[in-house]
């Protein structure tokens, strides 16, 4: 069995299966029925969370333990949250089929609906590029881009109409997302996409992240494996997870190139 060149830390999976506890862990009670889902810390130290049960977005102050909720509208289902450098939250809402911006200070909200041709898109994941544009995916077979400066939302069908899952931007500005048994490369100029099949046996690529030299890491939630693709030489490598029953979903690569 080959060892991972970077630590793969299935921390929360391990905790849920063993009952172990984190040293110094702290719990924050929320309003009854909040049903928190997506979570995103912002640069100012607050934590945004999707209160799926209340059709709202919450903001928690970990220092005081106080939280407030911002109503997103009837039928809202916040699926993913990204925080920008100013501390604002950008919410992918699958129920409203829209992206919402919630201000980090005054908590005012602004809605950017998706074009009618992408209804419902099944909004899934999002990431900012270096130009401040928000790239996003939809599980119903779409990828798109929101340019806040132009207030423009563009959407394109994913290759073969398959679900578009996790999305990332490499250090050199390339946009990639996971699509079950493939990775998809998006042209940042016109939104066109090229599908790159993963090795045979890959079942369900979900999370994706890029390291400091542009290699792509992806989790296979159907095969309990971690994959790495190097665009520089088109090479693939994969490693089995310690638990063959694991179903890895989200994936992040931190500033030290550690895969979580």
Task: Show which residues each predicted segment covers.
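Surface loop/turn motifs at the tips and blade-to-blade linkers of beta-strand repeat domains
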Residues: 28-32, 71-74, 113-118, 157-160, ...
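Short loop/turn segments that connect beta-strands within beta-propeller blades
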Residues: 61-65, 103-107, 147-151, 187-191, ...
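Beta-rich catalytic cores
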Residues: 35, 77, 95, 121-122, ...
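Residue-level detector of Asp-centered blade-edge/turn motifs that repeat once per structural unit
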Residues: 41-44, 83-86, 128-131, 169-172, ...
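A short loop-to-beta-strand structural motif that recurs across blades of beta-propeller domains
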Residues: 56-58, 97-101, 142-144, 182-184, ...
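Conserved beta-strand positions in repeat-built beta-propeller and related beta-rich domains
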Residues: 48-53, 89-96, 134-140, 175-181, ...
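Beta-strand-rich domains and repeat architectures in extracellular enzymes and scaffolds
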Residues: 28-55
